[in-house]
Swiss-Prot record:
Annotated organism of origin: Caenorhabditis elegans
Membrane topology designation: Multi-pass membrane protein
Location(s) in or outside the cell: Membrane
InterPro entries referenced in this protein's UniProt entry, alphabetically: 7TM_GPCR_serpentine_rcpt_Sre (IPR004151), Serpentine_rcpt_epsilon (IPR052854)
Protein name as catalogued: Serpentine receptor class epsilon-12
Pfam families given in the database record: Sre
Length: 341
């Protein structure tokens, strides 16, 4: 069985005088997991209440947050089970609660590693159905993606019951994320091309007919914004994903308890950084998220209501934009759409 988030406390208690410090470290780490769980609960609320994104993108992204939330709960159960002396480190297979929590955590890790590629896959559908994707949500797309994401997580958890399968699961996850990176670049290039076409006086039609209506222009702009955010997340979090995958891979080897502890520490650090950083990155790109977080901070007294922070207008690419330019561009688009209707 693949052992993740595992510290052999019995070994350190017998062979290492740093055992008291390790127990204190694990108690502190458990407190961090509790804080991270509260953080996940808050941003799950922000994600669904702010309604920044299309329903399908919100549901797929929300699944990632929910997975992190339940993964934290599973790890907290594992930590308390071990720290309170219920775990038999000499016969780890006999611990039903501990093994159940670890298996669930393995499912969460595999599913979480698939969530970003599935978010990009949802943008493929948004690009395919430019004409009416905003008006016709096609909720079955997100339902199917969430089902497939969880199915892959379950299959991964089953396969990793035999740690000899770890290399195959890791290879699949790395290839999937590499494919997602390439797909994201392709979608960005394609949407940028269409964006330039729909703002050009020369070409105002798709090659196969049909006009660049306001709905299509809006969807193209939304695709560019979300893909830019996803690209930033992929590049920024790529190093953490590599650390996470490597720690999982090394945990599958027959290594000493000390090295197992190092792998678990690297895995935990990657998850902490991942779960704390992604909401912050998304907040930087999402105006409604900033409004929701500031409103909450005002309610709890962490932000004064007297100070008003003016948010500059942003164009499709996230740059500052003067109000007059923004208004003129909007009416130019409206006039072009009216003339070509």
């Amino acid at each position: 069985m693949l052992l993740l988030h595992y510290f052999n406390l019995s070994h350190f208690q017998v062979n290492d005088h740093f055992y008291p410090h390790m127990r204190n470290f694990l108690y502190g780490e458990t407190a961090f997991y509790v804080a991270d769980t509260i953080n996940m609960m808050f941003y799950i609320w922000v994600l669904f209440s702010a309604q920044q994104f299309h329903f399908n993108f919100t549901l797929v992204s929300g699944t990632q947050y929910v997975i992190h939330f339940f993964d934290n709960l599973a790890i907290i159960v594992m930590r308390l089970h071990s720290l309170l002396g219920f775990t038999d480190d000499f016969d780890i297979g006999s611990n039903v609660v501990f093994n159940g929590a670890m298996t669930f955590s393995v499912y969460c890790i595999v599913a979480a590693m698939c969530s970003l590629p599935f978010s990009i896959l949802e943008r493929c559908f948004a690009t395919r159905y430019l004409k009416d994707y905003e008006a016709n949500s096609r909720a079955y797309i997100s339902y199917a993606l969430v089902f497939l994401l969880n199915f892959i997580g379950i299959i991964g958890a089953i396969l990793l019951q035999n740690k000899n399968n770890t290399i195959f699961v890791v290879a699949f996850l790395m290839i999937l994320n590499l494919f997602a990176l390439l797909t994201n670049q392709f979608l960005r290039t394609w949407n940028l091309k269409k964006y330039e076409e729909c703002h050009s006086n020369v070409s105002i039609r798709f090659q196969r007919g049909g006009k660049y209506s306001l709905a299509k222009r809006f969807q193209i702009s939304e695709n560019i914004k979300s893909l830019h955010m996803l690209n930033f997340i992929i590049l920024y979090m790529g190093f953490m994903n590599v650390c996470l995958v490597i720690s999982v891979l090394f945990s599958s080897f027959d290594i000493s308890p000390e090295r197992q502890a190092i792998c678990s520490l690297a895995l935990d650090a990657s998850i902490f950084f991942y779960s704390f950083a992604i909401p912050q990155i998304m907040t930087c790109f999402c105006h409604k998220w900033k409004v929701q977080t500031n409103t909450f901070r005002i309610r709890i007294g962490c932000l004064r209501t007297g100070k008003v922070n003016l948010e500059p207008l942003r164009d499709t690419f996230g740059g500052d934009m003067r109000g007059s330019v923004s208004m003129n561009r909007y009416f130019d688009q409206l006039q072009d759409s009216w003339e070509n209707a």
